[in-house]
Amino acid sequence: MSISNHLPKFHQHFILNFTIALVLVFLGSTAHPYYVGVTEVSIETAKKDIRVSCKLNMNDVQLNLSQTAGKAIDLSTITPANQLSLSALIQSGLTVQVGSKRINLAFLGYSVEDDAIWCFLEAKNIKYYPRISVCNNLLYNQFESQTHFIHCIVNSFIWLTNKIYKITI
């Protein structure tokens, strides 16, 4: 015999509604409140190459790719199909310009780190100009509050928020 048979209807509805509310609160708490990515652009003028690494929340990227593909995407397993999908996303949302020339970045791959993914790109034989422009609008269409921190390193000097720091290794 069930305990619900002994409770008044009001209590049964209260318990049901309370349980539903708890489930909704729990499900809502799994979403994270901040949508932040980190992009690092490293330029070695002597080598004439540009290396880019981009860190994004894996669940956010999977959601974006899944909606685009119309099917579930799981980036925790590195496959050629995942590499291709991720490359297309990164190439469409991340641009690096040196001087007045947009640089074609080759997607090298990605790695998984806890709940994040690191994407790696590079360009070789790039003539360096003093002006570098980096535009990262990855996931802005997906999340209104998405933001990105961009670090630009040129010959061991890093530019962060209009200040120049010397990196010592």
Stretch-by-stretch model annotation:
Residues 1-12:
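N-terminal secretory signal peptides that target proteins for export/translocation
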Residues 2, 29-30:
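Polybasic/polar functional segments that serve as interface/processing modules
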Residues 13-27:
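Bacterial N-terminal signal peptides
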Residues 31-169:
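N-terminal soluble domains immediately following signal/targeting peptides that reside
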